C-alpha cells in the first residue's frame, strides 16, 4: 500500500459535526471521528454514507475530518448515561489520516477520563500507538477485521488496507499488553480458514459473519470468485471455521 500516493488522490475536508455521540443498535453508542475511509474496501456497507453527505467521489477517495469532535464529546458526555461506545461504525478510526489528526486518540482520552467502556473496530496497526492508553481503561477491547489469510485475496477486496500479517501482529501485541482483543472474520472471504492457527493465543474471541451486501459482486465476477458468493460457500466456511476454532480452544460466535 503506497500511503503517500493514496493521500494525493484523496479529497480531505475539515467539517463541523452537529453531534458526535450517537445511539447505536450494535452498542449503546457509536462515535465516528471521520466520514469516509481511506481503506476503500470494495464490500464496505458504509459507502451508503455518500447519499447522506453529498459526496460524488468514489468510495475510498474522500474523508471528512470532524474537527470539532472533541469539543462536542466533552459537552455531550455530561448529558448522557454511561454506556459502551463503539468506535467506529462507518469509518476506520485508525485510517492513515488519524496519524496526523489524532481525533480517535483524543476521543479515547475523554472517554477514559469519564470511565466509559469502549470497543474499537479497525484494520490498522496504528492502534498500537494508543496501546498504553487502552490498557488504562477499566473496560476496553480492540477488534481487528481480518477476512482472509491470503494476501492476494486481501488485495482484491481491501486494496488500501494494511496487510493481514500486520493486523495479526498488532492483535498479538495488544493482547500481550493486556488489552482484550477479538477478530471479526467478516465478511468471510476465500482462504479465511488459514487465519485460525495464526490467531491461537492472540485473541479473546472471534466473530464470524457472511457477506451481507452486494457492493462487491462485480469484484467476485471480475476475478472468477463467483463460487464464494453463494450460501453453500458461506455455510461450508462457517462450519470449517467453527470446527477449527474449537480445536484451537478459541471462543467464537457465529453471526449467521
Where are these regions (language model features)?
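Conserved Radical SAM active-site core
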Residues: 2-141, 149-152, 164, 231
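Surface-exposed amphipathic alpha-helices with a cationic face
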Residues: 109-112, 135, 168-178, 242-250
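Conserved strand-turn element in the central/C-terminal portion of the radical SAM core barrel
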Residues: 160, 170-193
Amino acid at each position: 500500500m503506497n500511503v503517500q500516493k493514496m493521500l494525493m488522490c484523496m479529497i480531505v475536508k475539515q467539517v463541523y459535526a452537529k453531534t458526535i455521540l450517537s445511539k447505536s443498535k450494535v452498542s449503546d453508542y457509536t462515535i465516528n471521528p471521520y466520514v469516509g475511509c481511506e481503506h476503500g474496501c470494495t464490500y464496505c456497507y458504509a459507502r451508503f454514507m455518500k447519499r447522506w453527505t453529498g459526496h460524488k467521489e468514489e468510495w475510498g477517495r474522500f474523508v471528512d475530518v470532524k474537527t470539532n469532535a472533541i469539543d462536542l464529546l466533552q459537552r455531550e458526555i455530561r448529558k448522557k448515561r454511561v454506556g459502551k461506545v463503539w468506535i467506529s461504525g462507518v469509518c476506520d478510526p485508525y485510517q492513515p489520516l488519524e496519524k496526523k489528526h489524532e481525533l480517535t486518540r483524543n476521543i479515547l482520552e475523554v472517554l477514559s477520563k469519564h470511565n466509559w467502556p469502549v470497543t474499537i473496530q479497525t484494520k490498522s496497526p496504528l492502534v498500537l500507538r494508543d496501546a498504553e492508553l487502552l490498557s488504562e481503561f477499566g473496560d476496553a477491547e480492540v477488534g481487528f477485521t481480518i477476512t482472509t489469510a491470503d494476501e492476494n485475496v486481501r488485495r482484491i477486496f481491501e486494496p488500501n488496507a494494511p496487510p493481514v500479517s500486520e493486523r495479526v501482529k498488532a492483535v498479538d501485541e495488544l493482547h500481550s499488553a493486556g488489552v482484550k482483543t477479538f477478530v471479526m472474520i467478516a465478511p468471510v472471504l476465500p482462504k479465511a480458514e488459514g487465519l485460525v492457527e495464526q490467531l491461537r493465543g492472540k485473541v479473546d474471541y472471534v466473530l464470524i459473519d457472511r457477506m451481507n451486501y452486494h457492493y462487491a459482486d462485480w469484484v467476485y465476477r471480475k476475478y472468477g470468485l463467483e463460487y464464494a458468493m453463494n450460501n453453500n460457500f458461506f455455510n461450508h466456511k462457517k462450519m470449517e471455521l467453527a470446527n477449527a476454532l474449537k480445536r484451537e480452544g478459541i471462543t467464537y460466535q457465529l453471526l449467521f
